[in-house]
Amino acid sequence: MKIDTSLTMPQLPEALSQAGLQFAVATEEDFDEIMAMSQDIYGGLDYLPTRYTSWLQETNRTVILARKQGKVIALESVCVIDNGETMLVEGLRVAPQERGKGVAGVLLRFCCELVKSKYPEVKVTRLTRDDQLGPKDFQKYRLITKQGILLVRFRAEDLKLRLSELNLGGDIQSSLSTSSSNTPPVRLDHTAIHRLYLTTDLMQGVLPNATIIQDWQPFKPLPSNMAILLKKDIDWMVDDVANPTMASLCTFPYRVPVGDDWYYLNIDMFGKDLDLAQQQFLCHLQRHTTTLKGHVMCQMFLDPPLWKPMAEFCNKTLSVELVKEYTEQCVVESDVV
């Protein structure tokens, strides 16, 4: 299905207008072509194969393709959140041979114009990045918050054995003698999530800049956003329901194209207490590795000062492999003009 580009296009860079880009809404039939141009993207941790079909069905989301001479060369997804005031840009990818030519910028401008025509109340564009932000980026974007990215890998069977060696079979907190809490982390049901995040201000001091980040998606704690989040397979955890100082969201594991039998586990941590973070990390690992077989890439996002001690904990205590050194996840936004 073609989109009427007459309502959208700002002036194209001359080279691109001559190259002749066409834009269309993505369909199921485009999947194989999209995957073919997405090889090796995101270090093999591409979530799109798992999410593509559901993305096409989300009423508040538009997935746009750019074609050149009939071939898909770029994709971008835009999801309208925050009561219709924010467009969240996700999934950007450009075919290797077309990178560095300005395609991504043109596609983003196209998507912005399209969303503005459909949702005139949209005020802000928001996206999450893991590359180094430079002066030009800060001319375009405001930094909302940033988290340290800790990426480790392990075989599920090996980690299960290691957890049993650490005597974590039943009582995780008793195995962490330095823990600042004697009570185990609490997994929240939907009622408790609503109460904590929407009807009290208890999470204000825990969430980074009042932002719930779930697997690269930043949301404000609003009922409309919570309706989106609660449809997903996520474990929500806090250290204390009455007075939380540490919270985490663990997205259920899904397959990624690193190789056969590779899974991705995403854990978003909020708060500044290392011991409580370790407790919740272990609880998530224990819960989700029990049924997994094969290799797991586990990516944790946490307050930057916690990165180094948590990396040491992963290496020395859990004997899992650190995949890369410190990098940052940055949530940025700009006004829609």
From Swiss-Prot:
Keyword set, alphabetical order: Acyltransferase, Transferase
SUPFAM superfamilies reported in the protein's UniProt record: Acyl-CoA N-acyltransferases (Nat)
Gene Ontology MF term list: L-histidine N-acetyltransferase activity
One Pfam match: Acetyltransf_1
Transmembrane portions of the chain: none
Superkingdom to which the source organism belongs: Eukaryota
Catalysed reactions, semicolon-separated: L-histidine + acetyl-CoA = N(alpha)-acetyl-L-histidine + CoA + H(+)
Catalytic activity, EC: 2.3.1.33
Coiled-coil regions listed: none
Domain named N-acetyltransferase: residues: 21-156
Signal peptide location: none
Matches recorded under InterPro entries: Acyl_CoA_acyltransferase, GNAT_dom, Hisat_C
Keyword Disulfide bond on entry: no
Residue positions assigned to the propeptide: 1-2
Function: Enzyme responsible for the N-acetyl-histidine (NAH) synthesis, which is a major constituent of brain and lens of ectothermic vertebrates.
PANTHER family xrefs: LOC100145250 PROTEIN, N-ACETYLTRANSFERASE 16-RELATED
Additional note from the record: Strong histidine N-acetyltransferase activity has been detected in ectothermic vertebrates and not in endothermic birds and mammals.
Record protein name field: Histidine N-acetyltransferase
Organism of origin: Scomber australasicus (Blue mackerel)
